[in-house]
Amino acid sequence: MRPPLTSRLAGFGTSVFAEVTALAREHGAVNLGQGYPDFDGPQFVKDAAAAAMRDGHNQYAPMPGLPALQRAVADHQRRFYGIELDPASEVTIHPGATGALCATFAALLDPGDEAIVLEPFYDAYRPGIALAQARAVVVPLAPPAFRLEAATLEAAVTPRTRLLVLNSPGNPSGRVLDASELEA
């Protein structure tokens, strides 16, 4: 019988988030694993969501996202970070990080390419890269500072390197890379 998963996903087990969720349920604990607050959402947010559905905003959105939301994201980036973006061509809205990452890896990586990831990292990086038939190259960031050393990063780069996954603040460390690390 053929295994249920493709060979590209062999060796990837349950995510740490699924394990934490199961343990929290089993022991009646608060789940700090992945956005499970122990309080209800604000009523005004729930009311706005219900009103939007009543007003007919309950169909599939355009592939890149609703234009008003794309504009709001571009405005936010300009206002807070001084980054000018064209909402129609440079902002894509996605319903979740994991799906967005997989789509990005599939769009940017060819079979045999390498993607550098800084460790510790979000556990969806490796399987997403594997689905693109590429290879994750891990660059460890040593605790407690989790600093990115330019020499360590440079040593990981090969002719097959196509992508550097740079997430700041880091997930799960929360570490924000400083200007000297980003410039190196």
Predicted regions and their residues:
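N-terminal small-domain helix-loop-helix segment of the aminotransferase-like
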Residues: 8-96, 103
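CheY-like receiver
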Residues: 23, 104, 152-156
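Short acidic capping loops at alpha-helix termini that bridge into adjacent secondary structure
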Residues: 84-91, 111-114, 160
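Active-site phosphate-binding strand-loop segment of PLP-dependent enzymes
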Residues: 137, 141-184
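Short glycine-rich anion-binding loops that position phosphate/pyrophosphate groups of nucleotides
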Residues: 36-37, 98, 168-172
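Conserved PLP-anchoring active-site segment centered on the Schiff-base-forming lysine
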Residues: 107-129
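A short helix-loop-beta submotif of the ANL/AMP-binding
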Residues: 131-137
